[in-house]
């Protein structure tokens, strides 16, 4: 969950360029007869169609290459090696494990590379400004993936996607929101192109967009790596595509063709704005609740970042249920976290605070987070419960959770009891 490493939310995806992931059942997959000339002709036609839809101009040709599954896997491994360090990986894993999003034996790099290799249909590398098409994709998938990735190439020529993503890398939740802009627009344009070829359009058809979004959310269910991945990874992989598409559609309904420029020039600043576009239009900004303090002598700050509405929805769904996540998470107003490490003692402390839109929502989350702690740890001893405090000892040390007005805060992994 470290800022600067995968910007947390989409895992390593942001370092790899933009990937169009498979949304087709295994029965549809057969080895494609890839014809470079046919692909070249498709690229020209698709770019022309995208220009007509968006009003964005093509500045130069988009180079492309065919790539095998093994080459995709190696490409992703190389990108991990080039873009991260072992310490980056360790910190990222620590954050995910401290919140309970992944098990203690989780291998972040391997899981992400395997997951993206399994899902890839095509990807646009905005470092090299080049489109890669997988050689195992059938013609139907290839055609859709081409439009998706060419939408990225067109946006890159206007807005410099690598810079766009890097500008948000110091804020975890904002980074995911920007990824949703990038992937959501490409997914919307891919879907609109398909609709137009059938004589239809997404314009003015919010229900069709919602149906497509739900279909994509369930489209990875036949892939074993995806199926076995932690909920956090399954949700964060599809969020930029599904929720990003719905967000782009909402902006299109309000601004028409100007929407394709607007979302890049004035992007959403949180996953909440993506999930609730009216909050984007109203410029509702996330708050920054103060983190709880502890005696940090001998500790080094590893990382600090944001924890957004999307994260809280996943956390509540994982440890409680989806219904409660849907009811409570939208009341999120802002969240922060930090990890501090004492290497001599091999101890990592999680500091965490989240603000809600009213005291009642905070009270509900205070109760919900107690359930989260009871379920994420194998052993828990509660020494204080009530009057806005929940404290005791868990698997990794002492903890204390406090409710103060509309803010819930937590310290976890402490050496000494927080409440006597």
What residue ranges belong to the model's regions?
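Bacterial N-terminal signal peptides
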Residues: 11-23
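Auxiliary, metal-adjacent structural segments of Zn-dependent hydrolase domains
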Residues: 41-140
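Post-HExxH zinc-binding segment in Zn-dependent metallohydrolases
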Residues: 46, 157-162, 166-215
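Active-site recognition of the HExxH zinc-binding catalytic motif
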Residues: 50, 144-161, 186-187
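Acidic helix-start/capping segments at beta-turn-to-alpha-helix junctions
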Residues: 59-79, 170-173, 204-214, 266-269
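Short pre-active-site segment immediately N-terminal to the catalytic Zn-binding motif
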Residues: 131-147, 174-178
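Pan-zinc metallopeptidase signature
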Residues: 220-348, 353
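C-terminal soluble interaction/assembly domains
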Residues: 335-336, 340-420
């Amino acid at each position: 969950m470290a800022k600067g490493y995968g910007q947390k939310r989409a895992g390593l995806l942001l370092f790899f360029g933009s990937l169009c992931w498979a949304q087709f059942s295994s029965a549809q997959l057969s080895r494609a007869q890839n014809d470079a000339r046919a692909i070249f002709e498709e690229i020209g036609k698709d770019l022309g169609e995208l220009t007509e839809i968006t009003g964005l101009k093509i500045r130069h040709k988009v180079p492309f290459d065919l790539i095998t599954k093994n080459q995709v896997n190696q490409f992703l491994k190389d990108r991990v090696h080039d873009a991260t360090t072992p310490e980056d990986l360790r910190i990222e894993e620590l954050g995910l494990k401290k919140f309970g999003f992944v098990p203690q034996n989780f291998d972040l790099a391997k899981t992400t590379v395997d997951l993206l290799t399994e899902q890839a249909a095509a990807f646009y590398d905005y470092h090299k400004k080049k489109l890669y098409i997988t050689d195992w994709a059938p013609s139907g998938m290839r055609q859709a993936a081409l439009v998706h990735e060419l939408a990225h190439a067109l946006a890159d020529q206007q807005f410099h996607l690598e810079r766009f993503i890097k500008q948000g890398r110091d804020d975890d939740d904002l980074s995911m929101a920007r990824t949703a802009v990038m992937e959501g627009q490409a997914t919307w344009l891919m879907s609109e192109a398909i609709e137009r070829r059938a004589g239809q359009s997404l314009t003015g058809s919010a229900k069709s967009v919602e149906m497509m979004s739900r279909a994509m959310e369930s489209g990875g269910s036949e892939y074993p790596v995806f199926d076995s991945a932690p909920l956090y990874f399954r949700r964060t992989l599809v969020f930029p595509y599904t929720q990003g598409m719905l967000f782009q559609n909402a902006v299109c309904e309000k601004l028409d063709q100007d929407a394709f420029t607007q979302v890049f020039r004035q992007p959403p600043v949180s996953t909440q704005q993506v999930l609730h576009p009216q909050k984007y239009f109203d410029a509702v900004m996330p708050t920054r609740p103060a983190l709880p303090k502890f005696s940090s002598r001998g500790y080094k700050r590893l990382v600090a970042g944001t924890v957004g509405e999307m994260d809280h929805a996943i956390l509540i769904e994982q440890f409680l249920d989806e219904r409660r996540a849907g009811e409570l998470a939208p009341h999120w107003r802002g969240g922060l976290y930090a990890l501090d490490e004492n290497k001599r003692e091999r101890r990592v402390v999680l500091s965490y605070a989240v603000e809600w839109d009213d005291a009642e929502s905070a009270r509900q989350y205070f109760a919900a987070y107690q359930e989260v702690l009871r379920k994420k740890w194998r052993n828990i001893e509660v020494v204080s419960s009530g009057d806005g405090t929940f404290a005791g000892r868990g698997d990794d040390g002492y903890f204390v959770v406090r409710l103060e007005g509309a803010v819930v805060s937590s310290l976890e992994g402490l050496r000494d009891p927080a409440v006597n």
